[in-house]
Amino acid sequence: TVQKINTETYEVTSLTNCPNATEMAYEDGKLFLFYAQWGMSSPAFLTFDTKSQSAGTSFITDGTSIQSPYSISAVGGNVYVAESDYKNNGDIYCFGGDGKLFKKFEAGLNPMKVVLAQKDNI
């Protein structure tokens, strides 16, 4: 169950329309999530609009197949999904705001998170 905490009243409410998620990332009012359980034939990749509290369709729009998602990050309008089988080097899949894969690269064993650093005016 995904829950929301009101920062003024500290009231906790459940987001009842939010689909099940193994992992999720948040950016700009939207949850990007995947649901992958052992033995599933294929994982589900979905969005959830936190303002309207409605579930959306897959954020992957180009048919890219990811069999063993491990983690997810949303940064700068892009979504990054790490894939791992727990014994070989994993991959990072980079999707643009249009849901299309724009880059895939190897990232070592069990990649946990994508963090992008911004170069400030140094």
Where are these regions (language model features)?
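Acidic, serine/threonine- and glycine-rich low-complexity intrinsically disordered segments
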Residues: 1-32, 38
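Repeated scaffold domains used in trafficking and secretory/extracellular systems
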Residues: 17-29, 65-75, 107-121
